[in-house]
Design a protein with these regions (language model features):
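Conserved catalytic cores of large enzyme domains
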Residues: 1-378
Length: 378
């Protein structure tokens, strides 16, 4: 009554669902995402086994490590969101609405009337994956232009919308008719206005080389059971600033910055909110895509432009002039030129990955269980 044709062979298959190509009676080409039978129970069982494994670990093995219960709670929450296709449908609609004015970006058309918690029907996208350089070049595309627009839009999702794709691997980004098409909205991240405000505060601290301001932002953003040693955190941030402060933006490696930031947060036992944890994953994927299709592009340079523009646009001039004076604005005007800005702009954006950056050497069995679960979730 709905489909004229459904392919028996799946276009793709993962632990949670399979995707089949189909044709509506109207002739429209679509894909059907069908959830695997019993997957909810299977995932719930796996999480339960992991919780039991954590309880069996000797207490000494947890010293200095992340809060496993919290990590498992986060994994379970993310998994449940992905298993509700109505949530993904809502994400698609919100993403399309927020990017309606971006002429080079789109998302597949959603067929809401055919979508349920366990079945999602959307437009079939005919086009190469964003990392298929051979097909893109054969189609006359400029890889550098694609890379710039990809990152520009992603930073817009993060800094302006506070609603971003949290799993932007190459299979989830295609090129069709000159546009970047974002697909698979099952895993999306959000940043609150407070998150963005505090990130902005950290950036301003970097622009002024004000380690205390950065530290205040980090403390306000982070979550911790015991208050970190302020002097140690200050010294760690100072050391990080000195490491990247002499580099040009184009010389800064995002992956290296992330590793350093994660280590600082881990050493100070600071965890980031869920949204920033998701952002860490997304930015890592973005860096990988860029390295493949246009390695000459530096993501931090593009991000810094957005950050600088956002700071100017969002400033409350009367309030800021009263409290900070004109020198603050001269400092922010130089934001793009400050080498340390880009490295630490990610301070508030990427350090959340420490929540899942676990040191599992104490238990190989648990490490294997976690790896298996993560593969299932992904």
């Amino acid at each position: 009554e709905i489909f004229a044709f459904i392919s028996d062979t799946p276009l793709g298959s993962a632990s949670i669902a399979q995707v089949h190509r189909a044709e509506l009676l109207s002739g429209e080409q679509v894909v059907i995402k069908v959830q695997r039978t019993g997957i909810y129970e299977i995932m719930a069982r796996d999480i339960g086994l992991l919780r039991k494994a954590v309880k069996l670990m000797p207490p000494i093995s947890l010293k200095g490590m992340a809060d496993f219960d919290q990590v498992l709670d986060e994994l379970w929450n993310v998994t449940r969101e992905e298993m509700n296709f109505l949530t993904e449908a809502s994400n698609m609609e919100e993403f399309a609405r927020r990017n309606a004015d971006v002429v080079y970006v789109r998302t597949p058309k959603l067929y809401q009337e055919y979508t349920t918690m366990h079945v999602l029907v959307m437009e079939y996208i005919e086009g190469p994956a964003i990392d298929d350089k051979e097909k893109l070049l054969a189609g006359g595309y400029d890889l550098e232009e694609i890379g710039i627009k990809l990152i520009d839009n992603y930073i817009k999702q993060v800094m302006e919308d506070g609603f971003f794709h949290a799993d932007p691997h190459p299979g989830n980004v295609k090129i069709q008719d000159g546009k970047i098409v974002w697909i698979d909205m099952g895993m999306m991240g959000r940043l609150t206005e407070r998150d963005k405000e505090l990130i902005g505060k950290a950036i301003r601290g970097i622009a002024e080389n004000d380690i205390g301001m950065i530290q205040e932002a980090v403390m306000a953003l982070g979550e911790f059971k015991e208050k970190p040693d302020q002097s140690v955190l200050y010294e760690d941030i100072s050391e990080l600033m000195s490491k990247y402060g002499s580099l040009d933006m184009g010389e800064i490696d995002v992956a290296e910055v992330m590793m350093d930031l994660m280590e600082v947060m881990k050493e100070n036992k600071i965890r980031m909110p869920h949204g920033l944890t998701m952002l860490a994953r997304g930015l890592t994927n973005m860096e990988g895509v860029l390295a493949d299709i246009a390695p000459q592009i530096n993501m931090i340079e593009i991000a810094s432009r957005h950050i600088s523009e956002s700071m100017w646009k969002d400033l409350d001039w009367k309030k800021e002039l009263k409290h900070a004076g004109k020198n603050l604005y001269r400092s922010m005007h130089k934001a793009v030129e400050v080498p340390g800005l880009a490295a630490d702009a990610l301070h508030g954006l990427m350090k959340g990955q420490t929540r899942v950056n676990l040191d599992l050497h104490a238990s190989n069995d648990l490490a294997q269980l976690l790896r298996r679960l993560v593969r299932n979730v992904v």
